[in-house]
């Protein structure tokens, strides 16, 4: 653990409240983390998709643990606010691998992780979560363990019973040691409210165009709002627009909204 890790862990945990939901604009490298921190972020969350893309890999448990953790360590060293890492399914084939990944995350100085179930059976993710919790306990670390349920995001199972299945998974994951439940892919207020009402730990949703604003989500009981890979996608879209402008019309107008060179350079030059 780093010297600042216990204080950052306590701060990060305290930020999860529906009265003022924790808003996370997910970063994928040091520069994006510094820009997001300078914009007023109380914490930095990584996006596994954005990290993978920036390192030349597709998302989906393809990136190696070593490369992912090196990036987490660099981000932690570059910012003053707490950092939580998206570690996909745990970067490994079994619970023991997940425990090793979590030990690496803690060694990097992060104070939280996201672990997703994807298409795995609920019991398998519960085992991975329990291993993650035990790994943190062995290190004497206060790790915020956020369990991601992909039933809505991936459209898994019968739509008529999807909410019931999601809640069953949430309860199982909390019993396994999860401190928070992340349900991406949900945008309608009735479902969000039902999730918040029936889940005993802080609820995290993923936001984007069409999602209620942060304050509205808080009123529904949401304690944490993430943009996921959205900021990275927007950044790459800006790069594509600039290239299409240049190669299509020979123009440069799409560069007008860029961050000024001195400002960006200063963010990466001074002390954190």
Model-predicted segments: where are they?
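Alpha/beta enzyme core
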Residues: 3-227, 233-245
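A short, charged, Gly/Pro-tolerant segment at domain boundaries
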Residues: 255-272
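Short, highly charge-biased, low-complexity peptide segments
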Residues: 244-255
């Amino acid at each position: 653990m780093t010297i600042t890790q216990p204080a950052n862990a306590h701060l990060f945990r305290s930020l999860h409240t529906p009265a003022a939901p924790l808003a996370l604009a997910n970063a994928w490298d040091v520069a994006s983390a510094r820009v997001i921190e300078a914009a007023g972020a109380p914490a930095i969350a990584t996006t596994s998709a954005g990290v993978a893309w920036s390192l030349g890999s597709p998302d989906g448990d393809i990136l190696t643990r070593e490369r992912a953790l090196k990036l987490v360590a660099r981000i932690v060293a570059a910012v003053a606010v707490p950092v939580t890492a998206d570690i996909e399914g745990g970067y490994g084939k079994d619970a023991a691998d997940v425990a090793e990944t979590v030990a690496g995350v803690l060694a990097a100085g992060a104070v939280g992780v996201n672990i997703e179930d994807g298409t795995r059976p609920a019991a398998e993710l519960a085992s991975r979560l329990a291993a993650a919790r035990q790994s943190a306990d062995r290190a004497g670390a206060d790790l915020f363990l956020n369990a991601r349920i992909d039933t809505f995001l991936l459209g898994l199972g019968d739509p008529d019973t999807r909410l019931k299945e999601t809640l069953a998974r949430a309860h199982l994951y909390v019993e396994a040691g999860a401190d928070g439940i992340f349900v991406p892919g949900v945008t309608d207020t009735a479902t969000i409210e039902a999730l918040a009402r029936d889940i005993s730990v802080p609820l995290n949703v993923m936001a984007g165009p069409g999602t209620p604003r942060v304050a509205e989500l808080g009123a529904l009981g949401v304690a944490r709002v993430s943009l996921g890979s959205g900021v990275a996608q927007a950044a790459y879209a800006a790069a594509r627009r600039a290239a299409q402008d240049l190669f299509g019309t020979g123009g440069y107008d799409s560069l007008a909204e860029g961050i000024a060179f001195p400002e960006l350079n200063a963010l990466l030059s001074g002390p954190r």
